Swiss-Prot record:
Pfam families (alphabetical): Kazal_1 (PF00050)
Keywords of this entry: Disulfide bond, Glycoprotein, Protease inhibitor, Repeat, Secreted, Serine protease inhibitor, Signal
Source species, domain of life: Eukaryota
Organism of origin: Homo sapiens (Human)
Gene Ontology cellular component list: extracellular region
Site (Reactive bond): 51-52
Keyword check for Disulfide bond: yes
Bridged cysteine pairs (disulfide): 42-76, 49-73, 62-94
Signal peptide span: 1-21
Function: Probable serine protease inhibitor.
Main location: secreted
Protein name per Swiss-Prot or TrEMBL: Serine protease inhibitor Kazal-type 8
Stretches assigned to the Kazal-like domain: 36-96
Length: 97
């Protein structure tokens, strides 16, 4: 019984750590070399996006193309898989959306 309890605590602690440690804020467009930094962050973290979609609510971000994306993961998929040269302008919806 003691082993089961300690296993449950370990699983809970790991789950909590993952819920808060996975977030990967993309660099804002005001930073120099932001597209290169954005691509690096996306490549490092895109494999975590499937997990993020289950545990965290989407938080919209505004891209440099003035399109509102549902999350950093959504913007990363557009950059990596569709080859768009866009960066994150700011958190929240774009003003024209």
């Amino acid at each position: 019984m003691k082993g089961i309890c300690s296993d449950a605590i370990l699983v809970l602690a790991t789950s909590m750590w993952m819920a808060f440690a996975i977030d990967f804020p993309l660099p804002m467009a005001s930073e120099r070399g932001q597209l290169d930094k954005t691509i690096v962050e996306c490549l490092k973290n895109v494999n975590k996006c499937w997990f993020l979609s289950y545990i965290k609510p989407s938080e919209p971000i505004c891209g440099s193309d003035q399109v509102t994306y549902s999350s950093d993961c959504h913007l990363c998929s557009k950059i990596l898989f569709e080859g768009l040269n866009i960066t994150k302008l700011y958190d929240g919806q774009c003003e024209n959306s």
